[in-house]
Amino acid sequence: MSGLKIALPAPCAFILSRLHENGFEAYAVGGCVRDSLLHKTPHDWDITTAAKPKKIIELFSDIPVLETGLKHGTVTLLIDHEPYEVTTFRVDGDYTDGRHPDSVAFTTDIRDDLARRDLTINAMAYSPATGIIDPFGGQEDLNNEIIRCVGDPHKRFSEDALRLMRTIRFAAVLGFTVEPETLRAVHDLHETIGRVAKERIFTELLKAVCAPYAAEALRAAPELLFCAVPQLKNLKGVPQNSKYHIYDVWEHTLHALESIGTDDPIACLAILFHDVGKKAVRTTGEDGYDHFFGHAEKSAAFTDEALRTLHCDNKTRENVAELVLLHDTAFPKRTAKFRRLLAKLGYEQFYRLLAVSRADSLAHAPWCIEDRCKALADAKSEAESLQKADFCLSLRQLKITGKDLQAFGFQGKAIGETLNKLLDAVLCGQLPNDREVLLLHLERYTQKHK
């Protein structure tokens, strides 16, 4: 036990208090305790108790209750429209499918419940009455920045293969080191990740790749990543004999991920996949230099394939694949081409592309970084100026509409075609986005083509 105090939110304190008043041990448990000790704001407050589910429902009969988790001893209380999961102390049976316990049995000992959890930093409980209960050294591992399984790591990972990805995800989020026995078990059992639903793999991958220490964590367990997402195997073992590079493709990708400077999931995924097609197109010239002609197109195709397999939502998949396709873009210096690109992407996607291109550039050979980054900074400055001026980049911003064209006699497809021509004229600076000027231009056009 520890004398440390954790500030509980009022609903959580209320639940613990009512259970204690009725003779049942109850604790905040798991991630909320870990995050509190790290001085982070917990996303969820989970509660564990000696009370059985039916008793929990009885004690909180004055509160809306969801009974969807009764099979595993979980009751969800809705307080101020926020869900609080309350789960009876339990021990898990065998994990025949390598993902879920075949059965659960209730217990009256909090230590038995904590013993079934994945990592020591997640196996702590707290109540104001007892302080922190930490039978597996979670506080010490937090202090020493260590990721360690509870008990035998091979057993923990064999029970539930998703824990492999969770381990790497926590290393990526917290910047902690996975201790040797736990990391050895990750290596030994990485192929069992195939038991896990693709959606769950994607959820963990996304959390890991967007985290501050993503590169370090992925570098520690590449076999797991490549087994979870087979297309990413193409990053491994691909040299880049070129004056523009000092790393092979895998290390280049990790260095770029270190430099991404954002937790935007679309940008982070794009960096992870941006060179995944290089292996397929690599050639070596007579001068000994490697070339990767068409690698952006190939990488985008692999990206689309991988994200479909992972059941990524369509919008994210399309945006990521687009960034991968364009990541090697030389930003046009001509005003018209620049604005057309900006209009095609929109500001949000354009800024993502700049972030991806900058991270990619920072992972190149030192001599070429400065010029690349200056060009990107200039492009960002120009885009910001246009955005601040609310420059017209879309039909929505154009000062005339289809109804105006109908008044001049345009019909059907001609309306859309003409609006797009006018928009392009505005983008190129041939016409101002001024309603009177655009209407006058239309009038002259129709008179000329009568």
Question: What residue spans do the PLM features occupy?
Answer:
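Catalytic cores of the polymerase beta-like nucleotidyltransferase superfamily
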Residues: 1-450
